[in-house]
């Protein structure tokens, strides 16, 4: 049963405030200096169109403005959030859209700002031919209320009896209201069996999930009677807000549970029971952004399936086929995930391996060979470097088999085991087309790796059934090996075919894939830091006089 028609809308990971400064701008005014203003545009994921998001104030007569007006953006780690900053010289008598008023622009992703040292970046302004346009400085700051966690406990009294042979089995469903009037489910309590006066266990929920930072936004709570067949009976509902809930820190709050249908039919209807908020508290916790800002680096490693079941790379039917017109599923998966993670890795050097191939010249089978053919240094420069090495390997190795995951998982785990101070977190992307041949060893490797600062993403390509991969995912049943359970859930598996855009839009396909496979990484990183009691380091001090953009590796 669909509870309340809740829409499936993402809750922003957090809200980020961007502060903008510029240095050494072009001077377009004859008798004074420029009067600059910055316009921020964001790019639509679906249409790729740029839309104006907001503007800073105009600062008169300066080439080095520090703008007071900030941009507040919803931040999703798992999405490539492209930004465009246009700088204009504003003459009150002219329109800023005229080319003569344009001072330059910079393109970058929100993740690049957050992933910069201390969540600060400096970029050159470009766009005016033959001119040095100066630089733009961007600083990201997480809004403080985004780190709040609310903990509450509720009970009910004299709920309507819904079961013929016994009392009700009640549970609560919480919904956050959206700006368009719809509601999004954000929490469900446990079911308390056979009672009209249930007391639910205390639970915690991020405040942003409850109200998205708007303390007066409506929170709707439905009361249901649980049924085994899923057709849960609606008992009633009530509404509140975060601000109202927070008053329970000093007093009990009692809500009437109302059933609109009963209220219309029965004149003497009063309510379907009451729900009492017994306790409510708010605590702050460290966030993903805190760790990134404090210098934690995401180390990205790639492992690609070179087994024969992928088909001859020279044939169009192969999953590795290098078409001049479009990327293969392997290349799309690599690009989709890598282009987001690379923003959080300062050196942009990524180890990349293949498995399941025969290597020249002697035909040795390898389950962990460097794509760049350099055993001493498997690092590739940027995601484009990984793709280049992948394409080169397809021309030189022979696809063979079988499909072994354990060697490359253990390889990354050995590197992760050397880091225990929270300064680095490892993300391994495995792209494969089929059935795993070393399930026992892979489970053992995952269980061992679950105590280390690492996560594993597995993307299945092609038409195969991936039941074994679902088993490794561990969302429903924690992965175990020899009676030992994984300390944390560190594996995320998705079949790529579920994300392919039917119209053939590869950009949209990659965005959908990245959104799903990367969504769990921030929480997995936080779970590791919490279990090890590792606090984020303070961000490095800002450079008081930045003048030029840092060189790219």
From Swiss-Prot:
Keywords: Calcium, Differentiation, Metal-binding, Repeat. Coiled coil: none annotated. InterPro entries: C2_dom, C2_domain_sf, C2B_Copine, Copine, Copine_C, VWF_A, vWFA_dom_sf. Pfam families: C2, Copine. Residues 531-553 are annotated as: Disordered. GO terms for cellular component: plasma membrane. Residues 1-125, 132-255 form the C2 domain. Disulfide bonds: none annotated. Ca(2+) 1 binds at residues 163, 169, 225, 227. PROSITE patterns: C2, VWFA. Residues 299-500 form the VWFA domain. GO terms for molecular function: calcium-dependent phospholipid binding; metal ion binding. SMART domains: C2 (SM00239), VWA (SM00327). Ca(2+) 2 binds at residues 163, 225, 227, 233. Its cofactor is Ca(2+). One of its GO terms (biological process) is cellular response to calcium ion. Probable calcium-dependent phospholipid-binding protein that may play a role in calcium-mediated intracellular processes. Plays a role in dendrite formation by melanocytes. Belongs to the copine family. PANTHER family: COPINE, COPINE-9. This is Copine-9.
């Amino acid at each position: 049963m669909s509870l309340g028609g809740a829409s499936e809308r993402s809750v922003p990971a957090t809200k980020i405030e961007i502060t903008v400064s510029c240095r050494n701008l072009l001077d377009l005014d004859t008798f004074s200096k420029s009067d600059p203003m910055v316009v921020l545009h964001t790019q639509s994921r679906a249409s790729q169109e740029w839309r104006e998001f907001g503007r800073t104030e105009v600062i008169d007569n300066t080439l080095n403005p520090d703008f007071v007006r900030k941009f507040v953006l919803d931040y999703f780690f798992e999405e490539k959030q492209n930004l465009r900053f246009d700088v204009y010289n504003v003459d009150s008598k002219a329109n800023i859209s005229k080319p003569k008023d344009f001072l330059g622009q910079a393109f970058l992703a929100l993740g690049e700002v957050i992933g910069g040292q201390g969540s600060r970046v400096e970029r050159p302004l470009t766009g005016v031919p033959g001119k040095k346009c100066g630089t733009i400085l961007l600083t990201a700051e997480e809004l403080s209320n985004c780190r709040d966690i609310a903990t509450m406990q509720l009970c009910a009294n004299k709920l309507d009896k819904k079961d013929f042979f016994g009392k009700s089995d009640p549970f609560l469903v919480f919904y956050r209201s959206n700006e368009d009037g719809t509601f999004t489910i954000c929490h469900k309590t446990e079911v308390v069996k056979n009672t009209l006066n249930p007391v639910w266990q205390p639970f915690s929920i991020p405040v942003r999930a409850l109200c998205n930072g708007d303390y007066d936004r409506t929170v709707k709570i439905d009361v249901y009677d649980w049924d085994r067949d899923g057709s849960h009976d609606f008992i009633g509902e009530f509404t509140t807000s975060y601000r109202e809930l927070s008053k329970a820190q000093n007093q009990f709050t009692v809500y009437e549970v109302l059933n609109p249908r009963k209220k219309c039919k029965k004149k003497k209807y009063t309510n379907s029971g009451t729900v009492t908020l017994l306790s409510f508290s708010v605590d702050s916790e460290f966030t993903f952004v805190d760790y990134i800002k404090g210098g934690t680096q995401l180390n990205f490693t790639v492992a690609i399936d070179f087994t024969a079941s992928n088909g001859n790379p020279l044939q169009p039917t192969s999953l590795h086929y290098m078409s001049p017109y479009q990327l293969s599923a392997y290349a799309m998966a690599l690009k989709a995930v890598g282009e987001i993670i690379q923003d959080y890795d300062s050196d942009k050097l990524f180890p990349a391996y293949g498995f399941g191939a025969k290597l020249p010249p002697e035909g040795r089978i390898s389950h962990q060979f460097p794509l760049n053919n350099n055993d001493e240094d498997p690092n590739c420069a940027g995601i484009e470097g990984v793709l280049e090495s992948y394409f080169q390997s397809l021309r030189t190795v022979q696809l063979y088999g079988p499909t072994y995951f354990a060697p490359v998982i253990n390889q990354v785990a050995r590197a992760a085991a050397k880091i225990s101070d929270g300064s680095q977190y490892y993300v391994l992307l495995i792209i494969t087309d089929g059935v795993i041949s070393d399930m026992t060893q892979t489970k053992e490797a995952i269980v061992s790796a679950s105590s280390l600062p690492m996560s594993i993403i597995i993307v299945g390509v092609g038409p195969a059934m991936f039941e074994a991969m679902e088993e490794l995912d561990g969302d429903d049943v924690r992965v175990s090996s020899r009676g030992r359970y994984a300390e944390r859930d560190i594996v995320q598996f998705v079949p790529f075919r579920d994300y392919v855009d039917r119209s053939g839009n590869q950009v949209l396909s990659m965005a959908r894939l990245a959104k799903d496979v990367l969504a769990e990484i921030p929480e997995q990183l936080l779970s590791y830091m919490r279990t090890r009691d590792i606090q984020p380091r303070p961000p490095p001090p800002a450079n008081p006089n930045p003048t030029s953009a840092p060189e790219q590796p």
